[in-house]
Amino acid sequence: MAEVESGSNQRQNEEIEAMAAIYGEEWCVIDEVAKIFCIRITDDMDDPKWTLCLQVMLPSEYPGTAPPVYQLNAPWLKGQERAELAKSLEEIYMKNIGESILYQWVEKIRDALIQKSQITEPGPDEKKKTEEEEVEGEDDPILEHPPENPVKTWDLKISESAPEAEELPPIAHGAPITDRRSTFQAHLAPVVCIDQVKKVLAKLYENKKIASATHNIYAYRIYCEDKQTFLQDSEDDGETAAGGRLLHLMEILNVKNVMVVVSRWYGGILLGPDRFKHINNCARNILVEKNFTNSPEESAKSFGKKKVKKDKKKGDH
């Protein structure tokens, strides 16, 4: 048995080295010990229209008697299209039991994206522009989640009345929490306007590991002194209801002028309701650590906060 595991481990290491050599920076190590990896796959166009992130975990039985545990991360990939792609990957495994199949999986996904890009329907960029044009007359800032990027970078649409550009605020990173191979980590920044929210998200996604997280849930609360109201919003990023729960926690703690992003790297084992507990615990811990639960104004000043800008108020969620 030990010899079998040793052989599987050697074959896995050889395949991992080969994937890193072939795909370079597109191949990302999420957890080297748990053997969790991801790769960003595009349709091979100079300006990619469709992209997808394949996340895999290699069990000890792979490639001998078990397939990789995988997840397809792309907000646009749903329903029948997702089922068909998953079926094609499973067919590759069934035809190659006992063999290394990661390369075949990646290229199969790439072929599917290339075929999709050749269809005449508008790509995600065109669809997003149409949606923005429909709400162009609204005054409130709007959070857009472009479906074309599987590593989830957001493009915040800012109204014409938004404040002048603010500098990037400092970003703090909390201690990670790991449970059954899933890892959660919170990131915090003081913010006083939507432009800073945008800058913080962009800066976080420059980090390849954060960008490849299965979910990046976030919420922010900005106090508008002139109106004595809050500008606040949240994003689930595929983890249903997680953003709203995070925002509710921030409301209960009565924090102001701060945003929290919680990254989750899925480890292949479902956690059930425990995942929400870990998300909120990560957020609470970093808010307490940075003193936002005591005196939000003084805490923000310790980060070098600027004077509150007068943003338009967005409806609470």
Curated annotation (Swiss-Prot):
Domain RWD: 14-116
Modified residues (Phosphoserine): 295
Bias-annotated ranges (Acidic residues): 132-141
Subcellular location: Cytoplasm
Keyword Iron listed: no
Entry's Gene Ontology BP terms: cellular response to amino acid starvation; GCN2-mediated signaling; intracellular signal transduction; negative regulation of transcription by RNA polymerase II; neuron projection extension; positive regulation of neuron differentiation; regulation of cytoplasmic translational initiation in response to stress; regulation of translational initiation
Region (Disordered) location: 117-151, 295-317
Signal sequence segment: none
A GO CC term attached to the entry: cytoplasm
Principal place of residence: cytoplasm
Keywords from the UniProt entry: Actin-binding, Cytoplasm, Differentiation, Neurogenesis, Phosphoprotein, Repressor, Stress response, Translation regulation
Molecular function terms from GO: actin binding; protein sequestering activity; ribosome binding
Biased composition (Basic residues): 303-317
PANTHER family: IMPACT-RELATED, PROTEIN IMPACT
Function field: Translational regulator that ensures constant high levels of translation upon a variety of stress conditions, such as amino acid starvation, UV-C irradiation, proteasome inhibitor treatment and glucose deprivation. Plays a role as a negative regulator of the EIF2AK4/GCN2 kinase activity; impairs GCN1-mediated EIF2AK4/GCN2 activation, and hence EIF2AK4/GCN2-mediated eIF-2-alpha phosphorylation and subsequent down-regulation of protein synthesis.
The family this protein is said to belong to: Belongs to the IMPACT family.
Subunit and interaction comment: Interacts with GCN1; prevents the interaction of GCN1 with EIF2AK4/GCN2 and inhibits EIF2AK4/GCN2 kinase activity. Interaction with RPL39; this interaction occurs in a GCN1-independent manner. Associates with ribosomes; this interaction occurs in a GCN1-independent manner. Associates with actin; this interaction occurs in a GCN1-independent manner.
Descriptive protein name: Protein IMPACT
Lineage, highest ranks first: Eukaryota, Metazoa, Chordata, Craniata, Vertebrata
Gene: Impact
